[in-house]
């Protein structure tokens, strides 16, 4: 919400592509962190714990081979970490004496952070503590993080106390006394968390835990485990660490003044533009401003005022206009009284699931690439200029033989995303 219009209900901040790579392409925070983890010499086995709504987007940005542990519903960090730990042990076959390092995917970090993660894992493997936390040296009195009060100022020390997210004045006092940010980065042996989990939850293994997940108490890992653990170590980290959760912090991390088609004249000062549309944005005479455009909407704001956007976004009541899926993406082009027009892009080798609709007809027009459609069990090849009609009730899917662009027109009095019945013969992905 705070990064509207780039983020929305199904696309959170970690998926926004604003970081320019050496090849000129842009990547998101999750792509950046995932790439950093893959470069580690330890050859870590990486699994992403996430909600069901984010799986397609993760596969779109990281590939379909990435390991994902899916929460059936949101139950806070303790159940999520226990579920992921059980997944690593029971599904992936990782031994109880192996170490897991937990870290968020959305901070802005540099290469020294990934080196620090390896050190964190090595400390946990050494067995000097049941939990090893990364304490981040604060750069300002943040109200967004909890704080760790270490027992000393050594690179690795014990933990004296843990503090909840404070107000700015209290945070200043914590920092004066040597407190560190608690960024939610820690390491442990799988057996330790599984043992703690069995003390608090009645379950037999991953499958049983997954079935009972919706009944679990909503409780944080800090409260359930960290604050009660006496054998704990804190490893200091003094490198770059930023939460890019506001337009101010996001634009500070941008390597250039604009992303996407935009022009700024010489009178602009401290202005950043992120444009996901195909039409250009021209800025003249602006100061301390952020301009952002996406299919979801357009924001023009003073940077300081951009933090107060939430109540205005809540009033827009606009449907999701763009989404990335494991098979590609779609963008809403036009919303009519009895029609919805969408541009669909499928990656080579990908396909929609085999499905039907009861209250709408659909028409596909291929505008780029080659593919294969299946209509009520009958398959045929399609290419540029081909039109496929699908009346309500017929089962249909389309597979991309090359990258495929299709204009989809939905026709009906009551067009609803829930009007969809999956059938055997297609992929398991949500279209």
Spans of features found by a protein language model:
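Catalytic metal- and UDP-sugar-binding loop of GT-A-like glycosyltransferases, i.e.
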Residues: 103, 366, 409
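Residue-level signal for inorganic ion chemistry
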Residues: 15, 30, 84, 106, ...
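Left-handed beta-helix
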Residues: 188-388, 394-397, 415, 420-430
């Amino acid at each position: 919400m705070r990064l509207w219009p780039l983020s929305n209900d199904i696309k959170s901040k970690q998926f926004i592509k604003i970081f320019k790579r050496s090849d000129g392409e842009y990547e998101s925070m999750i792509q950046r962190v995932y790439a950093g983890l893959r470069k580690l010499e330890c050859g870590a086995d990486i699994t992403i714990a996430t909600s069901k709504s984010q799986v397609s987007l993760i596969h779109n940005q990281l590939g379909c081979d990435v390991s994902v542990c899916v929460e059936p519903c949101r139950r806070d960090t303790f159940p999520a970490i226990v579920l992921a730990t059980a997944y690593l042990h029971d599904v992936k076959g990782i031994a109880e004496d192996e170490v897991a390092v937990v870290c968020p995917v959305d901070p802005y970090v540099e290469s020294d952070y990934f080196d620090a993660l390896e050190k964190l894992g090595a400390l946990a493997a050494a067995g000097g503590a049941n939990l090893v936390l990364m304490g981040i040296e604060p750069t300002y009195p943040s109200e967004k993080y909890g704080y760790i009060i270490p027992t000393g100022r050594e690179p690795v020390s014990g933990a004296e106390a843990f503090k909840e997210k404070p107000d700015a004045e209290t945070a200043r006092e914590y920092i004066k006394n040597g407190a560190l940010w608690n960024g939610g980065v820690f390491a442990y042996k799988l057996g330790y968390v599984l043992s703690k989990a069995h003390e608090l939850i009645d379950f037999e293994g991953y499958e049983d835990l997954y079935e009972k997940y919706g009944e679990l108490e909503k409780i944080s890992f800090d409260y359930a485990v960290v604050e009660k653990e006496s054998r704990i170590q804190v490893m200091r980290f003094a490198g770059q660490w930023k939460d890019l959760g506001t337009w101010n912090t996001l634009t500070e991390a941008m390597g250039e003044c604009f992303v996407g088609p935009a022009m700024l004249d010489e009178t602009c000062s401290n202005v950043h533009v992120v444009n996901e549309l195909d039409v250009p944005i021209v800025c003249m005479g602006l100061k301390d401003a952020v301009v952002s455009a996406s299919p979801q909407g357009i924001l023009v704001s003073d940077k300081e005022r951009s933090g107060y956007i939430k109540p205005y976004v809540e009033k827009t009541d606009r449907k999701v206009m763009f989404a990335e899926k494991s098979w590609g993406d779609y963008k809403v082009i036009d919303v009519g009284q009895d029609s919805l027009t969408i541009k669909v892009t499928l990656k080579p080798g990908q396909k929609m699931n085999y499905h039907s609709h009861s209250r709408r007809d659909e028409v596909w027009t291929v505008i780029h690439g080659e593919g294969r459609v299946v209509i009520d069990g009958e398959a045929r090849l399609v290419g540029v200029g081909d039109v496929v009609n699908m009346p309500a009730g017929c089962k249909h899917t389309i597979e991309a033989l090359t990258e495929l662009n299709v204009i989809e027109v939905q026709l009906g009095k009551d067009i609803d995303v829930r009007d969809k019945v999956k059938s055997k013969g297609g992929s398991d992905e949500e279209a």
